[in-house]
Structures are given as structure tokens and as C-alpha cells.
From Swiss-Prot:
Complex and partners: Homodimer.
The family this protein is said to belong to: Belongs to the acetokinase family.
Gene, per the UniProt record: ackA
GO CC aspect terms: cytoplasm
Function, as annotated: Catalyzes the formation of acetyl phosphate from acetate and ATP. Can also catalyze the reverse reaction.
Name this polypeptide is given: Acetate kinase
Length: 385
């Protein structure tokens, strides 16, 4: 029988479960990749990318996903579950490292739901269901915000009265599990040391950038919420707060309507009127699609300039996540606007998605590497075994 750990990553309409085999307190292999998603009135279940079932939704979708997983799990007689790990997007001011989840921890995390309504409720719903169903094993919460606890106070503060800082209205930063994976596995992937002053660009449906100095987070593009920073698939990125006040006072929009607008109807989707998927927009002939891509690139270039200033220089630029790792076109567009930094891209290496894509004469080394949030969570979980 194989000892395994389960890694869960829940969203509002999907649940990703990765199952890793463990030997001698080391992660050996990922043996199952399970993806459940809500699609119209059904829940689709994929195991190792093959669709296994389509079930009518009759109850709470997330609970049904867990039940479907359990039905499958009961048939896996050769697997012994010894622990679970959970991606929790927001750890607030107190959770600076992974923790074993108990009732107190669960309560403390629930208090943070208003800070991240997009992810936190579903992260915690799945965590609580596993706590109820598998009481005899340990359950570990790993936080996207923890990586940024090394940020100095000057990078966390907003220009609000001091009492709000004390209440936790600060810049937290997100995508920390991705940044931790890339920075800690960088040499293994590229055979190079992580540059001293590095910017990692995590570009996907949600996007952010992080300035890393000597392997530690200095500051990042996302702040109090996952809305901040660069424009994303359906999220605005950074906007003037006066816009929100205007929408309330003059457009008579409710906070619920504004939340829907900022989180789900803006970004690439809102600008293009077509899609939140960068591949679809790159293939489109629509002027609005082109403008959406140009704005996406422009905002990223501005952010790289800001983070370079925070680092007081830059030695390395690393692209990662779905768009960052796989879109040679977007990497080229961004890099072309950074020639003032001495960045030069090797077109052949870039098109082949090689890890090192800059030329030998480039003053900044540029890389494209995968991220693996599930694996970094698994590596954290085994530290508790």
C-alpha cells in the first residue's frame, strides 16, 4: 500500500486535487490529478485529464464535488492517506507559515473571508469538509500571503490614518506559493543561481509580480486584495479609488454590483468584450482584443519599472504561470518594452519556451519556467509528518 498526501485547491466553481506518493518523508510522484468543475447544471469530473463523469447538480456544488471524490477514493484500496494540504489564499497578519488546522485555526481563518471573498470561502469550505471526514489525519493550511511576511513596513502601508494599519488594512501580497516554488526550485530547473535582484512575473488568469532580493520577497504588485496590481483576465487591477466612489454616488451601484464588476467583468474580458483568455484574444482580429492585450502588456511593463525601483536594480526577470511560461508572444511584447533595462530576448529560445530566453549580451537574464503550487504545498506538508 502506498502512503499518499492529498493537496486541495478550491475555487468558487472548481476543485483541484493532487495526490502525491510519499516515501521516506519525501515527495516521490504525483500519481493522480483530479479536477472537478461546475459546468452549467452539471459537475464534471476529470481524473488525469480524462473525463470520468458528469453529474447533475442537486445540492451545494462544493459538497457534491467532495462526495464525488469520496466515491472515487473508496475504490482506491492500495492508497493510504496520511495527510492533506490546502491552499488558503489569505493568512492575514498572523499566519506567516503553514499550520496544522484545528478548530481555533479554522475560526481565525473564517474571520478573514471579507479580505478575500473571491477565494477564501471556498478554500475553507473544502478544508472543513476534509476535517470532518478524515479526523484521524493531519490537515495543513498553506498560505499565499506567508511568502510576503518579509516585506518591510514601508512597502505595506497605505496613505491612510495609522489606526487602519493596526486594523490590518495593509498590503499583503498574493501568489506566494507560486513565488516560493519558483525561487526555491529555480536552480534545479535552470542550473543557475537565483539572481540577487529578481522580479518574478506570475501571469495567468490572475496575475501579479514580485520583487525578490536574496531569495526573499521585498514587495509585490498585489496589495490588500487580489484586485490590485496589473490588469488580469476578469479583474481590473489597480484603479483610482475615486472610480468606486463615483460608481456608488452617480451610477447608484451597490457594493455587490461593484464587486461583480471589479472581480468578474473587467480586465481582458471587459476591455475586449470577447474573452478573458489571452490565447483567444491573440487569435482575434478585433481592435478591442488588440487593445486589451496592449493594455495588459503596458500595465505589466509599468509594474516591472516600479519593482525595479524598489530593488534599486534588476539582475533577473522570470516569467511563470500559464501565460508567463507558455506565451512566447506576450513575453516578447513585454521584453521589447524593457530594452531600456538592457533586456534582449533570443527569439529562437523564446519560441521554444526554453528556460533561459535572453541573449548572452542581455544585461538582465530572462527566464521562462513552470510553477507548481501543489508540489510546494506537498513539500510543506511532509515537514509535519
Amino acid at each position: 500500500m502506498k502512503d499518499v498526501i492529498l493537496i486541495a485547491n478550491a475555487g468558487s466553481s472548481s476543485l483541484k486535487i493532487s495526490i502525491f506518493e510519499i516515501q521516506n518523508k519525501q515527495v516521490k510522484d504525483k500519481i493522480y490529478n483530479i479536477f472537478l468543475e461546475k459546468n452549467d447544471n452539471k459537475i464534471l469530473c476529470y481524473i488525469n485529464k480524462k473525463q470520468e463523469s458528469a453529474t447533475d447538480i442537486k445540492d451545494d456544488a462544493i459538497e457534491m464535488m467532495i462526495d464525488l471524490f469520496e466515491d472515487w477514493w473508496k475504490k482506491q484500496e492500495n492508497l493510504n492517506l496520511i495527510a492533506t494540504g490546502h491552499r488558503i489564499v489569505h493568512g492575514g497578519k498572523n499566519f506567516n507559515k503553514p499550520v496544522i488546522v484545528n478548530e481555533k485555526v479554522s475560526e481565525d481563518l473564517r474571520v478573514l473571508i471579507p479580505l478575500n471573498p473571491l477565494h477564501q470561502p471556498y478554500n475553507l469550505q473544502v478544508l472543513d469538509l476534509f476535517l470532518q471526514k478524515y479526523k484521524e489525519i493531519v490537515h495543513i493550511a498553506c498560505f499565499d500571503t506567508s511568502f510576503h511576511f518579509t516585506n518591510p513596513p514601508i512597502t505595506k502601508a497605505f496613505g491612510l490614518p495609522k489606526k487602519y494599519y493596526a486594523k490590518g488594512i495593509i498590503r499583503y501580497g498574493f501568489h506566494g506559493l507560486s513565488y516560493k516554488y519558483v525561487s526555491s526550485h529555480f536552480k534545479e530547473m535552470t542550473k543557475e543561481d537565483l539572481p540577487i535582484k529578481t522580479i518574478i512575473a506570475h501571469l495567468g488568469s490572475g496575475s501579479s509580480l514580485c520583487a525578490i532580493k536574496n531569495g526573499l520577497s521585498l514587495t509585490s504588485s498585489m496589495g490588500f486584495s487580489v484586485l490590485d496590481g496589473v490588469m488580469m483576465g476578469t479583474r481590473t487591477g489597480n484603479i483610482d479609488p475615486g472610480i468606486v466612489l463615483y460608481l456608488i454616488d452617480h451610477e447608484k451601484m451597490t457594493t455587490k454590483e461593484i464587486t461583480e464588476l471589479l472581480y468578474k467583468k473587467s480586465g481582458l474580458l471587459g476591455i475586449s468584450g470577447e474573452s478573458s483568455d489571452i490565447r483567444t484574444l491573440l487569435a482575434s482580429n478585433s481592435p478591442d482584443a488588440k487593445f486589451a492585450i496592449d493594455l495588459f502588456v503596458y500595465r505589466i511593463v509599468l509594474e516591472i519599472g516600479k519593482l525595479t525601483a524598489a530593488l534599486e536594480g534588476i539582475d533577473g526577470l522570470i516569467f511563470t504561470a500559464g501565460v508567463g511560461q507558455n506565451s512566447a508572444v506576450i513575453r516578447e511584447m513585454i521584453s521589447a518594452k524593457l530594452s531600456w533595462l538592457g533586456i534582449k530576448i533570443d527569439d529562437t529560445k523564446n519560441q521554444k519556451n526554453e528556460h533561459l530566453i535572453s541573449t548572452e549580451s542581455s544585461k538582465v537574464k530572462v527566464f521562462a519556467v513552470p510553477t507548481n503550487e501543489e508540489l510546494i504545498i506537498a513539500e510543506e506538508v511532509i515537514k509535519f509528518l
